[in-house]
Every structure is written in structure tokens, then in C-alpha cells.
């Protein structure tokens, strides 16, 4: 086995996964009662009780560091990636782990399993192959109260909040089984929490923050975003919500995204040590132009309407921000290009006069299509197309651009058929089974390859005016029809490939193709490299230089 390879667990090893992979689920089985799941032998107590360790568990644990936050978007995901890379640079075999992630940004492993993009990036930082055990529970929200539940990389079904909480026992078993098998194969596990451990109303249902830290016996770093303000009050408030046992797990605080002279923070750090007995172990500066995908939209540099005026010679690209937008990381490589003005559009009044309109993926395509029509954005898109301008759709965006969306299984809508925008000769049908495919290489209309991954329920048929010019290069598919992953109709392009713009050569070739069509001079060379390896090394260098690594190692029983 090569370094970083992780053996795959079979469905039989995890009853929840076995249930999630059942292909014959009929609609009358949709209550997700998990009756086919063998119950856990013990109902593990919740965080805040004397112990969450199952009886008989060995006291020896793999050294573990856990990043928790005072809030969402505090920087946990990025810092977890930083410590993964630091430990790997120091010669340790590392695995990331997040028990439960609620995110619409996901990817596909080599084994065809779906997991959060954040843990995929962290795996790359650890130089390990992404493995669904690193993110055993993925929640993909489709409404304010419900999510699709993905267990160990396979869709289980849709649940509302109370139904999900009712499966705590089985879910906890899936989490701990995944953690134990992963931890047994590495030297250090870097865990990430979710949201904040100080959410008192959710604490009884916790399986991702302090309960997980307790199970892993992890050294916990509490991360806060000082750029938002109120950081030290957030540190104190979170600490006050902890039990004595939880406070003993807390090793230190990390001040994130600081701008200025760090010596000015000295009095605040002394106060934290005096009043909580826990030191600040890092002050991480605000890092500009990092170009590492963020977990939350709030962390994206281009995810704000006010992105400056368009400069001469640049392409103005408007990304239509659907209410249930997924995989907006698809556009991060474009944001790094100096001749691109990438901006989100959420309302018709933000439209402007874009050169290119991008329609991203969506977790709820039909409701988002309804939103586009109600908001007036559909009229903007149709007018843009009537003027012969460029449109690019990805995944759900592809389906929206077609003539019709069929939903015979009622996956998204009670309506069996909904008209699309009619801009491409495509008809998409939501299938009961989900397509999860990594595409190492795909042929494209530009004659240069790209790649990516597919995550969708839709199966698309095309008419004669939609040319199937995106094709999976893998000859394992017996027919050309099975290789199709995208279409072209003049200046209207659409593909199921997430990550299609990650490839530097394809991205620049496409940009220059559009520039030439608009009468702008093509650059004919890469102006920006979307190189995660260099970005991760840069991140690790900054975090290492601004963290008390000696204390962090010592807290894990290392060095």
C-alpha cells in the first residue's frame, strides 16, 4: 500500500452505510427509520456528563489536535489544513477528521464517495488520499429545516432536524467507527469542530465538538476571528459554557485574521490566562490572496457584491448566486485571474452588463429556478442570451438552462415536470440514484483537457442543437453517450463537471477564447496558477511562524 492510502471499509462493516447504499428504496420506505441498522450496544452519554467514552475502550489514543471556533467562519477549516501540512512537513502521517459537516461544497473520492470539500483540501494538506471516513456525516441542506444526509460517502436520504436528532445513537456509532479505523492508521489526527461548541441549545445533540474531542482525547484549540470584533468576549463566553471536563481539554486560544502589531494584544492575552488559566497559543495574521477554497461563502474574497469597478480589458463575469448554491468553489480559480472581474449577483438590480453569466450548482434546482423567475433574474438571463452573450452552467446550472426538468420520483418537487429556461436543447430527469464520479481527464470543446468530479441526481438527454463536446476520457465507459459530461450551443456552454476551471491550461484557454470573441487581445499564457500545493505550503509557513508549536506538540504528548 502506498503512503497515504487508506483501506476501504465494506458496507457490511457499518450498518448505517449498508443502509445508505440500498438501491431499492421505495418511496414508502422514505421514513428513514433505520430499522435495518443494528443498534449500538451502548447509548453513549452526551457532552457535559462524566464521560463519553464507551466502556472498555483503551486509554491509549492516537495523538490528536482539534480546531474549534467561537463561530462559523472563524477559520477552523483553513487552520486545520495548516496544521495538517505542518505535521506532514515534520514527518508525521496525518489524517483530517470532521465528524459532521453541513455544507453544499462537496467532492468525490477515488472510491466514488462524496465528502466535504473542506476535508478534501485538508487531506491534500496532509498528503493523504481523501477518504469518506474523514467526514463520516455530510449534511447537504435543502431547506431551513431539512438536509440530505450522506453517510460515509453515500446518500442515506432526506431528514428534518428532529428526525436526524432521533438517529443520534446510530450516527454516533458511524462517527466513532470511522474515527477509530482512521486513527489506527496514522500518527496524528487533526479534527475540526462545527460552528461553535458554545451553542447551548444544541449541546445535548453534540457529536462534532466537545463530545468528539472527549472521545478522541484531543488537545483543543479555540479559534476566533478578530477581524469581526468582540473576539475576547467570544473566547470568554465560550469558555464559560464549558463544563470542567471540557475546560481540561482546552489547550489554548488562536487569534485569527489579525491586522496590525500583535504586541498590542498582550494585555488581552494576559487577561485570558489570568481568568481562564488557558493561554493564547497563536496570533495568525490576515493572509491575503491565499487561494485556498473556504468552507463558508462568507470567507470568499469574491463573494461580495462590491468588488470594485470594471477595468478596461477585463471580463466581467456575473455568478448568479442561487439560494441553494452548491460548490461555489468552482469559481475560485477564476477569481485569481487578473483579467477577470468576478462578482456575485443575488438580485436583479445587481445585474449590470456582464460579459459572461455563470449559473452554479444547486442542491434544490427546481426551487432555485422558481426563485429566478420571481426575482426577475430569469428575465435578465434570457435577455443576456437573446443578445448573443456568453453563458456557462455547471451541474444544476446545466439543468436550469435546459428545456425541462423531470422529477418522476418527487426528489425536489411534487410537479412531475417543470420548464427550464429553454436556452439549451436539454431535458434532465432526476434519478433515484446519485451519480458520484471523479473525472481525471475530460475532453473539452477547446481541444485541451480538464477534469473534475460529478455529483448529481440528474440524467440529461440532448437534442441536435446541444453538441456533446465535454466527454469523459475514460474509455471504461462502453458508449459515447455514457461519456458525455457537458454540452455546447454557440456561446451557451454547460457541464456536469465541478472543478472544471481548476486546470490552469483549460481555464486560460477558455478565458482567451471568450476574450477573442469579444474583440479583446488574448493573453496566450497563464497569468495565475491555481496551485493548492504552493498555497498550502505558504499557509503552513505563516501559521507555524505565529503559533507556539512546542506547546501544541507537548499538549498531544509529542516532543
Regions found by a protein language model. Give the residues of each.
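Cationic, amphipathic, low-complexity segments that mediate targeting or membrane/lipid association
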Residues: 3-4, 41
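Ala/Thr-enriched low-complexity intrinsically disordered regions
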Residues: 11-14, 18, 42, 55
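Intrinsic-disorder-associated, low-complexity terminal segments enriched in Asp/Asn/His/Tyr and depleted
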Residues: 13, 24, 28-31, 43
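Leucine-biased recognition of intrinsically disordered, low-complexity hydrophobic segments
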Residues: 16-17, 32-34
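Flexible phosphate-sensing "switch/lid" loops adjacent to ATP/NTP-binding sites
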Residues: 34-36, 43, 52-383, 390, ...
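Catalytic nucleophile serine of serine hydrolases
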Residues: 395
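A conserved active-site-flanking secondary-structure segment within enzyme catalytic domains
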Residues: 402-460
Amino acid at each position: 500500500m502506498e503512503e497515504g492510502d487508506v483501506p476501504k471499509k465494506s458496507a457490511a462493516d457499518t450498518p448505517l452505510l449498508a443502509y445508505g447504499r440500498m438501491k431499492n428504496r421505495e418511496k414508502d420506505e422514505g421514513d428513514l427509520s433505520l430499522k435495518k441498522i443494528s443498534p449500538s450496544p451502548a447509548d453513549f452519554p452526551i457532552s457535559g456528563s462524566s464521560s463519553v467514552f464507551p466502556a472498555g475502550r483503551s486509554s491509549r489514543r492516537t495523538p490528536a489536535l482539534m480546531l474549534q471556533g467561537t463561530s462559523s467562519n472563524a477559520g477552523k477549516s483553513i487552520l486545520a489544513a495548516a496544521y495538517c501540512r505542518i505535521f506532514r512537513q515534520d514527518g508525521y502521517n496525518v489524517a483530517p477528521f470532521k465528524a459532521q459537516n453541513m455544507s453544499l461544497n462537496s467532492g468525490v473520492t477515488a472510491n466514488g464517495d462524496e465528502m466535504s470539500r473542506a476535508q478534501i483540501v485538508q487531506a491534500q494538506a496532509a498528503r493523504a488520499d481523501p477518504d469518506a471516513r474523514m467526514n463520516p456525516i455530510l449534511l447537504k441542506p435543502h431547506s431551513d429545516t431539512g438536509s440530505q444526509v450522506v453517510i460515509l460517502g453515500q446518500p442515506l436520504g432526506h431528514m428534518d432536524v428532529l428526525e436526524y436528532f432521533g438517529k443520534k445513537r446510530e450516527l454516533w456509532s458511524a462517527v466513532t467507527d470511522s474515527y477509530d479505523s482512521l486513527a489506527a492508521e496514522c500518527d496524528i489526527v487533526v479534527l475540526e469542530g462545527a460552528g461553535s461548541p458554545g451553542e447551548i441549545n444544541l449541546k445535548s445533540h453534540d457529536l462534532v465538538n466537545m463530545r468528539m474531542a472527549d472521545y478522541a482525547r484531543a488537545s483543543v484549540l479555540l479559534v476566533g476571528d478578530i477581524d469581526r470584533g468582540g473576539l475576547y468576549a467570544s473566547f470568554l463566553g465560550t469558555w464559560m459554557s464549558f463544563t470542567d471536563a471540557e475546560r481540561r481539554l482546552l489547550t489554548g486560544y488562536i487569534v485569527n485574521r489579525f491586522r496590525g502589531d500583535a504586541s498590542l494584544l498582550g494585555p488581552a492575552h494576559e487577561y485570558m490566562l489570568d481568568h481562564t488559566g488557558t493561554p493564547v497559543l497563536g496570533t495568525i495574521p490576515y493572509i491575503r490572496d491565499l487561494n485556498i477554497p473556504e468552507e463558508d461563502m462568507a470567507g470568499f474574497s469574491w463573494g461580495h457584491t462590491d468588488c470594485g469597478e470594471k477595468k478596461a480589458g477585463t471580463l466581467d463575469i456575473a455568478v448568479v448566486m442561487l439560494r441553494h448554491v452548491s460548490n461555489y468553489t468552482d469559481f475560485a480559480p477564476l477569481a485569481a485571474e487578473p483579467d477577470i472581474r468576478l462578482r456575485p449577483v443575488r438580485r436583479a438590480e445587481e445585474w449590470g452588463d456582464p460579459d459572461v453569466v455563470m449559473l452554479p450548482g444547486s442542491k434544490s434546482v427546481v426551487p432555485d429556478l422558481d426563485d429566478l423567475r420571481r426575482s426577475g433574474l430569469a428575465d435578465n438571463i434570457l435577455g443576456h442570451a437573446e443578445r448573443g452573450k456568453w453563458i456557462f452552467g455547471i451541474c444544476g446550472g446545466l439543468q436550469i438552462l435546459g428545456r425541462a426538468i423531470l422529477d418522476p420520483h418527487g426528489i425536489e418537487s411534487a410537479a412531475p415536470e417543470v420548464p427550464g429556461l429553454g436556452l439549451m436543447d436539454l431535458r434532465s430527469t432526476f434519478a433515484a440514484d446519485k451519480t458520484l464520479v471523479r473525472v481525471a481527464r475530460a475532453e473539452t470543446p477547446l481541444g485541451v483537457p480538464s477534469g473534475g468530479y460529478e455529483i448529481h441526481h440528474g440524467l440529461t438527454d440532448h437534442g441536435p442543437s446541444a453538441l456533446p463536446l465535454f466527454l469523459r476520457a475514460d474509455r471504461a465507459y462502453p458508449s459515447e453517450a455514457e461519456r458525455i459530461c457537458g454540452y455546447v450551443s454557440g456561446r451557451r456552454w454547460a457541464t456536469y463537471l465541478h472543478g472544471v476551471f481548476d486546470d490552469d491550461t483549460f481555464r486560460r484557454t477558455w478565458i482567451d477564447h471568450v476574450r477573442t470573441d469579444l474583440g479583446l487581445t488574448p493573453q496566450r499564457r497563464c497569468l495565475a496558477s491555481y496551485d493548492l500545493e504552493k498555497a498550502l505550503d505558504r499557509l503552513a509557513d505563516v501559521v507555524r511562524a505565529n503559533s507556539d508549536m512546542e506547546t501544541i506538540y507537548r499538549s498531544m504528548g509529542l516532543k
